Amino acid sequence: MRAANTFRQLGARVQPDDPPGIDRCNAIHATLWPACCRQLTEGMADGGAALDPSLRAYSDAGAGISRQALLGALIERGELGAGVNAFFERYDLVICPVYPRVAMRLTEPQSGDKLFPHFTAWCNQLGLPAASLYTGTTSEGLPVGIQIVGGRHADALVLWASHILELAFGRAPFAELARTLSSSVAGGKAH
């Protein structure tokens, strides 16, 4: 991984390890996020009809979550947080993927009802500072990124590490990426 090698070249000690309970955070997120979306859309005059299909899918999934399941997820989140906090007493940062695959083409079918696991869920659920950074493109020109995660209240460290990697990899060429992505859409025109 280029990001890990960059930190290693700068003198950081880099070693593979996984924070405890990350897989459980996705399960907790699969309860808490839909329940939250459901609460938000119930307060909207149109019930969230104008929202992005993926948010509507989360809201629909939230309708079947019981108060008991919600409370159980909140309790488990607290327990997992204690384990992850102990992990960050041994490590300053985690470098990990943002998503389990590279970016999807705009022409790939989007399923509004498929709830994808995200490598960001554990950060969201445990209140950890994280930053997603551009690190290059695939051979097809699709953007690739990584995520830097710090322990609770380590926001400044995450921002500093992000700055270091941005200096090493450069900023994302947004105009060029937008043209590439636009031209990948059937019938799309590059501008």
Locate each region found by the language model:
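Short, surface-exposed loop/helix-turn segments at secondary-structure junctions
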Residues: 27, 72, 101-120
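General small-molecule cofactor/ligand-binding pocket signal
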Residues: 13-18, 131
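An anion/phosphate-binding loop that grips the pyrophosphate of nucleotide cofactors and donors
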Residues: 91
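Structural helix-boundary/capping segments
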Residues: 1-10, 71-72, 82, 125-191
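Short, hinge-like loop/turn segments at secondary-structure boundaries
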Residues: 31-35, 113, 149-150
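Short helix-loop capping/hinge segments that flank enzyme active sites or metal/cofactor-binding pockets
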Residues: 32-85, 134-143
